[in-house]
Amino acid sequence: MPASTSTSLLTDMYELTMLDGALKDGTAHRRCTFELFGRRLPATRRFGVVAGTGRILEALERFEFDAEQIDWLRDQGIISEEAAQFLTTWRFSGDIWGYAEGECYFSGSPLLTVEGTFADCTLLETLLLSILNHDCAVASAASRMTIAAHGRPCMDMGARRAHERAAVSAARAAIIGGFQGTSDLEAAKRYGIRCIGTAAHAFTLLHDSERDAFDSQVAKLGAGTTLLVDTYDIRQGVINAVEAARAAGGELGAVRLDSGDLVAEAFKVRGQLDAMGATSTKITVTSDLDEYAIAALGAAPVDSYGVGTKLVTGSGVPTAALVYKVVQREDSNGETVLVAKKAESKSTVGGRKVAGRVLGEDGYATEELLLVGTSFEEGQALLAERGARPLQVQLVRGGQIDADAWGSEALSRAQERHLRARNELPYQAWRLSEGEAAIPTRYEKVG
């Protein structure tokens, strides 16, 4: 049976059982505020990168329960007839504020603030966490890799190392973190990302000789293509690659190294290319790279990097460990009550947060300021008084999605936004070693 285009069942069962219970006891329509945040950053991360909000808005557009889904939920005994009738006409009608995609975040940063009825807020929980926990982890890893690359382009080549759908979202998240292209055709088509790729070792092995394979590739892609030179002997591979390009009337664009001691081989290949007069031919390296391997290649004559497994799996941090908690609700008298979880190691701070980044006189960030218990309108003025840059934007108003917050143009803006946000962090943020967050988070209660 083909999968439904609706995103409403991409959720945990208890979201529906809570809805059913709340409908029965009359609390489903109480106004609530939920926040999505991380209690702390992973030990190896000095900052996080917001990615996935554009995908959330795309998914929210299709978040409704169709008749077949409702019948199945009822037949399974998951929902009652009352809940089934409610879901028939339900669509999210609340408000969502969030950090702009590409922004950096820290401990406690309210990446999303969802306001509406309890029914509105609870039904979205799993989908929001599923998307942001994955995409933020990948974008954060991508940012560390592009830091390590010091301006040399990084390309996503991880499609074969992830679930086919996860690979598409990972490619998008990698772009936000500073990557310049992807090998994944679906991601390139869907999000307007530059697509990259030439040939694998299998193409060389298919032909009777390496030179035959290179001649074929150059005939198809032109002399400016990238030729993989380590199928057999690297030294002879470089000779064959340069000669194949010149036989076609041009200079070779690049060679790719995918095995061996990449630092040593890069120096040898650069010397060989220069000796042959191929001074404009670039060197790209692949082979299970992560930010540490890229940093180790910093002094080598490498021009670009192709990253696969470590990128799409978050480079040791496969989830951003974000949570989604109610921070205030309406009581039986219609009054707003701040609520917080008090359990040790999993406590939360009650009340809506309005977030800003405080900058020092030198233009570098000094702290993440979270104003507690104020409205977004009042909070913006208070942030200005404190010299803090506002971090949240409205993504959904009364159920209406901001169309400018998703799509290929929004993705390009997110990448640019991330580079600006990262550049305003203190130098500690650029360290790859374990350590404290680049800036502290401070809560300030208002009123």
Predicted regions: what is each one?
Residues 2-30, 44, 276, 281, ...:
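Gly/Ser/Thr/Ala-enriched C-terminal appendages of enzymes
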Residues 57-63, 98-101, 105:
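An N-terminal, globular interaction/scaffold subdomain
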Residues 71-72, 140-144, 158, 430-437:
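Short coil/turn segments at secondary-structure boundaries
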Residues 1-30, 40-42, 84-93, 102-279, ...:
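Buried, small/hydrophobic-residue-enriched core segments of structured protein domains
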Residues 21-79, 147:
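Extended boundary segments
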Residues 256, 283-286:
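Extended hydrophobic secondary-structure segments that form protein cores and membrane-embedded regions
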Residues 78-92, 408-409, 425:
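Short, basic/aromatic beta-hairpin or loop at an interaction surface
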